[in-house]
Regions:
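Glycine-rich, basic loop-to-helix element that forms the pyrophosphate-binding segment
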Residues: 146-163
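Acidic donor-binding segment of Leloir-type glycosyltransferases
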Residues: 106-148
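Short alpha-helix within the catalytic core of nucleotide-sugar-dependent glycosyltransferases
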Residues: 99-103, 128, 157, 165, ...
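N-proximal low-complexity "stem/linker" segments adjacent to membrane-targeting elements
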Residues: 31-106
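A recurrent flexible, glycine/aromatic-enriched loop bordering the glycosyltransferase active site
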Residues: 153, 161, 211-222
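The conserved acidic donor/metal-binding loop of glycosyltransferases
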Residues: 172-176, 201
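Short aromatic/hydrophobic "clamp" motif used to bind/position activated sugar donors
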Residues: 168
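Conserved donor NDP-sugar-binding/catalytic core segment of glycosyltransferases
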Residues: 180-214
Length: 222
């Protein structure tokens, strides 16, 4: 699970930040600040450019599956192949993030999933077009337009109500899944078909999806 969502940060590596500046990243920054506000933008800046105690990028690159591995996963047939529903409450989502989130499902190496999006932005025509586009192209992408924003809790409940799967996962509207995320979940379920809940590690990724940072590696449950 990968998130672009901000959290509190420490000192900023200014040299690293200035090296990343370009007309493209500056425009991205202004769009982010306009959508989320200056406070969240500042938190995001700290989060993105604070120094890491242990460099995560090299570790991540060493463990991500190769294209050959992903292709092998796509061909694998499991004895137990449950439908997995991913519920997403969406409100005024930047369409770039919306596309990235949907496409992270479409490229999953495990194919028995459905994406249940509740759109609480009835006046956002860009979101409407993107949702209609993906839904028309892939029947696993489903969405429901609300007449008004009911708040994050009720929007989420409406997304859960759409779900038909044996297992239901929740994503924020600007989250992503690694391409092998659902495969790894279903692989574990082969040995634990009676499991009631599963959880995964997560990290954060740049808007361009080219650099991962701030991992949250969770311990075994006890």
């Amino acid at each position: 699970h990968m998130s672009k969502k901000p959290s509190a940060g420490g000192k900023i590596q200014w040299t690293k930040m200035f090296r990343k500046l370009s007309p493209y990243t500056i425009r991205k920054g202004f769009r982010y600040m306009k959508h989320y506000g200056p406070k969240e933008f500042w938190i995001r800046l700290h989060e993105r450019f604070e120094p890491e105690e242990v460099p995560y990028g090299p570790w991540y690159r060493a463990y991500i599956p190769t294209e050959e591995t992903l292709e092998t996963q796509r061909k694998q047939k499991f004895d137990y192949s449950p439908l997995i529903s991913i519920a997403v409450p969406a409100y005024q989502t930047p369409v770039e993030f919306l596309r990235q989130m949907i496409e992270s499902l479409i490229v999953q190496t495990y194919s028995n999933w459905e994406l249940c999006i509740v759109n609480a932005s009835p006046d956002n025509e860009e979101m409407q077009k993107v949702l209609a586009e993906y839904s028309a192209g892939d029947s696993r992408v489903r969405f429901c337009n609300l007449k008004e924003n009911l708040g994050i809790a009720e929007n989420t409940n409406r997304a859960f109500a759409m779900a038909k799967g044996e297992f239901v996962g929740l994503l924020d509207h600007d989250d992503l899944l690694a391409p092998n995320a659902l495969y790894e979940i279903v692989k574990i379920l082969q040995d634990h078909p009676q499991a009631d809940a599963l959880y995964t590690d997560e990290d954060k990724v740049t808007t361009e999806l080219d650099e991962h940072f701030q991992p949250h590696l969770k311990p075994d449950f006890n």
